[in-house]
Amino acid sequence: MYVGPLKALINDQFRRLEDLCLHAAIPVHRWHGDVSATDKERLRATPGGVLLITPESLESAFINYGNRIPKIFARLDHVVIDELHSFIGDVRGVHLRSLLLRLTQIIDRKPRLMGLSATLADFDASRRFLDSDSPERVEIIQDLESTRSIRVGVRAYPKPSPGSGDPDEEDDGPRIATSVKEVLEDLETITTGAQPERWKAPPVVDEQTALTNLAMDLATVFNKSANLIFTNSRRLAEMLADELNQIATHQKWPRNPFLLHHGSLSKEVREDVERRLKIGEPLSVFCTSTLEMGIDIGSVHSVGQLGPPWSVASLVQRLGRSGRREGESAILRLYSLDEPPSPKSSIEELLCPQLLRSIALVELMLARWLEPFDSDSPQFSTLIHQILSVLRQTGGCHAKRLQELLLSHGAFREVANSHFAMILRGLGSNELIEQMPTGEIILAPLGEYITHAKDFYAAFTGVTEYSIRQGQLDIGKLPETSIPPEGEHLLLNGRRWRVEQIDSRALVVEVVPAHGKKAPFFGGTAGVIHTRIAATMREVLTGKSVYTYLQVDAARLLEGVRAYAKKLRICELPWLDRGNSCLVFPWTGSKGMQTLRACAKSEGIEVDMESISITYRCDSRMIAQHLTRVAEGRFDVETLAASIANKCQDKFDRYLSDELLDFSNSRRILSLADAIEAANGILGRR
């Protein structure tokens, strides 16, 4: 059995394996939502050969064919988990481990597990994932002979605003910079304490906006050969694809080589892009994580990254998509996209944190450092999912059997029995389960309803999406919150559409081509930044190193940012005293920042938190006393977690008690150790 994280990856491997196994008379099967019922039934009737499947489809097998599982997998010898790094420390990973461990108990045999990944650094976590009982028995096989060279360039651009280049958007603000040259001029003026002249000028609608400038650069750099251009949001990908389509039309290009590939586009659109790349067509594709995995798209000359990703691992994974041919270098062009200076700019924004993070990620990548996997979360929501799954599969069982199956011999061995009992009581009080006079636990009507829903197979939270169609053409899907009213416009697949009709029952939006546009909001959350990345950002800001991979504008911008930080003594002073408030740069990761905010809130101190700074609404004396208490570890992390506003993060969290939510959030969102280290650093006790 081959387990892959994406249907597209499974389809790709299926095509390769089917040809490979044809002459050996080894049947190859695939099982996911797009595979016909006939093909699935053929596998269930005569199991054997190779099965390619996603965790969610394996879940559906347990749910819908529970009594046939022993027969289907009776001779399972090997399990290959592709892109192993994408599962470890993640909801889907815990879900997959639970299913595999349940499977071994049902078929009473232990198949050999193998994990494949190009970006693994935390081998201890990888070993535990494959064999919790005896992780020392897991063998690590590394390619230590690889000497592939890499070429990196970092460029700086003002961040395009959502309305950039949109004639329907009114420009009623000050005239702000649209190039790095103008950003530097403004930054130098601000450093002297003055206000840039352009802010005083009347608003100007400038055709050379930040979006157009960036698009023209991309058109110059990526107009030949095959390239992948990764963005951190589908919104930016759509904006740039549309801008380039307008440029191509206006300038009468013979062809527009810029296409899109992301999860909101239809399968047909994505597969067409993959096919054209694979046959060697010179295309540059704006994409998100959908092409980060190992789908076969042929040779890619270079990789673009618009805005730094959240992790070094993601940067390495994306860079690895290029330079796969013998003798070729892997090429990365990283664009930092910071907000241009304006009258509303914060001090943090003037430090260009995107540029600092871009450099920090490259430096850590060159040092061969990758983030360790986060295995602190107890994954209570996924445990609830698996309890419901077992009850649906079996029809009911005793609490002791559930405990043995999922905790003692399953994927939730770290969960205390007391917490497990609290979870069962919570499911009972919420009427998802009920207990028979015999002691057996079964699904209550609400539990039956939940496990029969289409989205139950996934342990992670989904969103309601509408299909976007032009006649019979399926363009893609958009979240419900992104659908504009009838008569208004949207962007999808780099094209402009007008909404003609919305069918809320069928979840379908009918559109026609149009000239107006409105960039869709796809949702999503900010990623988690590791403490070492934040610390490296500080080193970049305070150091004097010259980074040879910085393009001229990026190097000059770093000089300007360093001069501004030096003038304000940002890295010398513990905080910037503003009378009734203090601005602090903790240089810690996301968990440390959240914990510092929670500590302040617990003592009644109001704070405003940005990505790398916190403004404390108090005077210097109070903040010194407060941070001293933080540094001395006088806070209880579960008490801090009780103050978190949005406690429910995962799919079934709403069925957990506050006590369990606080326990979970104290580990998955907060880190008292990081906060203590940061407070000591702020107070000069590093």
Annotate each PLM feature.
Residues M293, A411-F412, W497-R498, L507-V508, ...:
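Short beta-strands and strand-coil junctions in structured, solvent-facing domains, enriched
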Residues M1-E59, I63-T394, K400-L443:
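Helicase motor core with emphasis on the C-terminal RecA-like subdomain
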Residues W369-R496, Q501-I502, R578-W587, K591, ...:
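C-terminal accessory/connector segments of nucleic-acid motor ATPases
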Residues A194, E328, V463, D503-L576, ...:
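Terminal, basic amphipathic appendages of nucleotide-handling enzymes
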Residues K159-P162, G447-K454, K517-P520, R621-L627:
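Short, charged/polar, Gly/Pro-enriched secondary-structure boundary elements
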